[in-house]
Swiss-Prot record:
Entry-linked Pfam families: F-box (PF00646), FBA_3 (PF08268)
Highest taxon of the lineage: Eukaryota
Source organism per UniProt: Arabidopsis thaliana (Mouse-ear cress)
Disulfide topology: none
Protein name: Putative F-box protein At1g70970
Amino acid sequence: MENSSSETLHVEDLQTEIMSWLPLKSLLRFVIVSKKWASIIRGEQFKALYLRRSMTRPRLMFMVRRIATLPPEPEMVWFQSFCKEERCIPGQLEVEFLFHSVYQEKIPYFSSGQQQLRVPPNTNYTSVSQPIGGLICLQSETKFALCNPGTKKSRALPDIQAHEKAFITSFLGYDEATNVFKVLCLTMVWAHEPSKRVYEYQVLTVESGVESCSWRGITCKEKDHTPETQGLCKGGVLYYGARSTSDHRPLVMSFNVRSQEFTAIELPDQLHISYFWNFVIYNGDIALVNESDFDPRVVNEPNGNKVFHIWVRDATAQEWQRTRIEIPRWEQNVGHVDYVFRGTTGTKELVFAQDSRHCEDDFFVLYYDTFTKDLRRFQIGVTGPKISVRTCLDHVDSLWLM
């Protein structure tokens, strides 16, 4: 009897180990065909194991805004009615989001493990967070939803209470140690006199297996500020560029997802971040990139090489270091097409994506190997006219929201 029980446990462990390496589409099928497998896959222990394994095979995520030409996907029909409070203007073209991802380090590049999800159009402006922990946060004015592009599962979140004239900015953070997501929302009610402007900071906590959640006000002990860049979450800390409302100085704000504490990170005097700056991961560290440095009108080196500088945050020394990067034969290989630096892969390859403001029917990504000096070009495989494309590294598969 004991041997039979031991053998059963061994078989279950083996099944769990095998399933933890399978693609999401296979697990979604297993959930349907077997109650036993569904119980394993939806268990918290397996979800955590699968997320850890997924981090070893990260994805490149493309967030494409384009004209909607197809009916909404069945899994996302609810989002259209969830956000749409006004009817579309007759004759107005509707814009949808397409989330397209591929394995960023697996050969053959850009054709391994393709996933796509189309989010239907709505009349209000929709903003999309940086992917973290396999999820993205969709915001349409005061409405929010979490979405898992890999499983095509979504969850509507409570509306935030804000003044009708408030400017609302949101970020998505994730704490790996506690397995908790938090949506950070900053609202500002604008007034001509700075002293009369009202700033509020609120957080929504989302835990696995917990259905109810609500917005809670928190205190920012640092200076009141207005966000100026997109956010990036790393190691349980959310970073975003901002400007102090008191002296208008640029700074970087960090938000500890677990403790919910803000910290203002001062910048060197020569570093003036604005809307054109973006956060990336450079060889494992947080870095700031000025996207205007990649304007094709900026003259490259006389030999045709591309030289640009980024500011890397040294976590140990707690300081910013200006880093010079040179790409040989850039003009010869790239010409006058706009490409922007998006960070490095786990294999330390530099990734450049076409400027989303000037994308055409075809959209390409460059990989530069710092050891072999090879510069390779890949097409993302999304056809049709695009309004904009946002490229994010290190997206992962996750079983959240299943």
